[in-house]
Amino acid sequence: MIKKVVLTGGPSSGKTTVLKSIVKEFNKHFVKVIVVPETATELITAGVRMFGEDKIDALDFQELVIRTMIFKEDNYYRAAEMYEKLYPNQDVLIILDRAIMDNLAYVGDEKFIEVLNRLGLNGDYSQIYNRYDLVINLVN
């Protein structure tokens, strides 16, 4: 069985601590855990950003983030299917450090829908919600 869980929350809400605890606990129970790193941080670290002197447009940045997130989510799910095939008695847990909906906070509803439309999602939030089995929102 493969499950996709999103770990989200504001700065200093404890995501890193909770993530480490989840991985440790599930590994004890022989569950294969795959952690999908936060996409925006990867892009920013690589030099692609929507702030500073060499910034790109905020909507273009969000499109890159969401497009990359979708690719990564699908790719890691495929890896989980490979594990499931090789080890049919072992469950797989995919933990995502943030999810597509987190990007709404950076551009607002109208612009977010515009980005979704660019990606062929037609502003349909249900297509996004249905990608996950559980969302854990940590608050500080």
Where are these regions (language model features)?
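Conserved substrate/cofactor phosphate-moiety recognition/catalytic segment
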Residues: V23-T68
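ATP-dependent NMP and nucleoside kinases share a basic, alpha-helical "lid"
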Residues: L96-N140
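Hydrophobic anchor at the beta1->P-loop junction of P-loop NTPases
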Residues: L7
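Conserved lysine of the Walker
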Residues: K15
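Extreme N-terminal, non-catalytic leader segments
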Residues: M1-K4
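Hydrophobic positions on the alpha1 helix immediately C-terminal to the Walker A/P-loop
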Residues: V18
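The conserved Walker
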Residues: P11
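A basic- and aromatic-enriched beta-loop-alpha substructure that forms the phosphate/nucleotide-
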Residues: I70-F112
